[in-house]
Design a protein with these regions (language model features):
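Aromatic-lined, polymer-binding surfaces characteristic
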Residues: 54-222
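Extracellular ectodomain segments of secreted/surface proteins
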Residues: 45-57
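Bacterial N-terminal signal peptides that target proteins for export
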Residues: 1-11
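Bacterial N-terminal signal peptides
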Residues: 11-20
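Non-catalytic all-alpha helical scaffold/repeat segments
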Residues: 36-47, 82-91
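Boundary at the C-terminal end of the N-terminal hydrophobic targeting segment
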Residues: 21-25, 29
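Short amphipathic alpha-helical segments that mediate assembly, nucleic-acid/protein binding
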Residues: 28, 35, 48, 133-134
């Protein structure tokens, strides 16, 4: 009996050592090349024609996700092709939205503003913004502003994060006081509960990530 217990202990110790080795390897692993390869695979069929088509189809979520994702990949890899992609998508969107602001609204566009603002910020840091972008950005934010959209899920938090970023980018915008008021309302609505109410893992992670970014980017944490 003692021998069996001793063997079990050795097996457990061995298993823990193996897990520890794999955990250390996981911590040292560089996932960026794999992420870049996956992004390249997903965007291999993107083109100027496709971009304009999606903008005119009011696929605001697709357009803003692509411009921000490519900008983030540039920031992570410093590969110029990602910055070029972000500039191309952003520039086309600004041009088309300027001609027809009805194209600024589309399905699930509650995701749009925070991605648009993120792309703007990275392009601004690299002197890649097109002429007239500021006016379109502010108009886009105003058209998506809904002070009564107070809800504790990823849709509400995505909107709030977008307005946090707009407040930081355009502190002198005419509607900035209303944007800030909305952000504070959303923050306090969530803070009373201090929980993520989403049941789906993906949406829960989006919600939690937004809460962290709102707290950091609006100086709600020291």
């Amino acid at each position: 009996m003692k021998v069996m217990k001793l063997k079990s202990c050795f097996w457990l110790i061995g298993l823990l050592l193996v897990c520890n080795v794999y955990a250390q390897e996981l911590c040292r692993a560089d996932f960026l090349p794999k992420a870049s390869a996956a992004f390249d695979l997903l965007t291999q069929k993107y083109s100027e024609e496709r971009i304009v088509k999606e903008i005119r189809a009011k696929n605001v979520r697709w357009v803003t996700n692509l411009m921000s994702a490519s900008a983030v990949f540039y920031k992570a890899t410093h590969e110029k092709r990602y910055l070029d992609m972000s500039e191309q998508v952003f520039g086309n969107a600004i041009r088309e939205w300027k001609k027809n602001e009805k194209l600024m609204h589309g399905k699930d566009d509650f995701f749009a503003l925070q991605n648009l603002a993120l792309a703007y910020e990275i392009l601004q840091d690299n002197d890649r913004l097109p002429m007239g972008a500021d006016e379109v950005m502010i108009r886009f934010a105003d058209l998506h502003f809904d002070p009564d959209f107070v809800i504790d899920n990823n849709q509400g938090q995505e909107r709030a994060l977008g307005f946090v970023r707009m407040c930081n980018l355009f502190p002198d915008a005419p509607g900035v006081s209303h944007w800030k008021e909305y952000v504070d309302k959303m923050w306090h609505f969530w803070y009373r509960n201090k929980d993520v109410d989403e049941t789906a893992t993906l949406y829960a992670s989006i919600h939690l990530n937004d809460i962290i970014n709102i707290a950091i980017e609006s100086d709600k944490v020291a």
